[in-house]
């Protein structure tokens, strides 16, 4: 008769496991699924943002270069009277214009590095450059 009580205990344990799954397990299962879906959507959003940053930077650079904006700014700045040019040079306006017009992408990368993020290029296919935004903080938390 001991085998019968062991068998009934196994049946009761099975039904208890099913009851626990319906009581708490479904919630945990759905929550874990939503966590995975949220991680995937955040990753996709970051990858899309990186792609859009690359596309918009390239488009803006080509537009600015085709319109001749840097040459026009240099010629207009050279036409300024001496005291005004000296005042602007004191406040660093020429350097700011040079950064904006010449190396805007580098300034963006330096700003990202300042907040411990880095954009790295991951090329598996040279015709389609891919970028990866990487956190530079190495702390486990």
Curated annotation (Swiss-Prot):
Protein role: Plays essential roles both in the entry of the viral genome into the bacterial host and in budding process. The formation of the G3P-G6P complex termed adsorption complex is essential for correct termination of filamentous phage assembly.
Membrane topology, as annotated: Multi-pass membrane protein
Record-annotated membrane-spanning stretches: 3-23, 33-53, 80-100
Keyword Membrane (UniProt): yes
The encoding gene: VI
Segment forming the signal sequence: none
Organism: Pseudomonas phage Pf1
Keywords: Host membrane, Membrane, Transmembrane, Transmembrane helix, Viral penetration into host cytoplasm, Viral penetration into host cytoplasm via pilus retraction, Virion, Virus entry into host cell
Family annotation (InterPro entries): DUF2523 (IPR019670)
Protein name listed in UniProt: Head virion protein G6P
Family per record: Belongs to the inovirus G6P protein family.
């Amino acid at each position: 008769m001991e085998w019968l009580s062991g068998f009934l205990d196994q049946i009761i344990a099975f039904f208890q496991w099913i009851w626990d799954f319906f009581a708490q397990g479904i919630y945990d299962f759905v929550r874990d699924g939503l966590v995975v879906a949220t991680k995937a959507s955040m990753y996709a959003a970051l990858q899309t943002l990186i792609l859009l940053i690359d596309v918009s930077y390239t488009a803006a650079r080509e537009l600015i270069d085709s319109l001749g904006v840097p040459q026009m700014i240099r010629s207009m700045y050279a036409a300024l009277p001496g005291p005004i040019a000296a005042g602007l040079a004191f406040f660093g306006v020429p350097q700011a214009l040079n950064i904006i017009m010449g190396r805007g992408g580098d300034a963006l990368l330096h700003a990202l590095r300042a907040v411990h993020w880095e954009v790295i290029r991951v090329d598996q296919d040279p015709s389609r450059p891919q970028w990866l935004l990487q956190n530079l903080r190495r702390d486990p938390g």
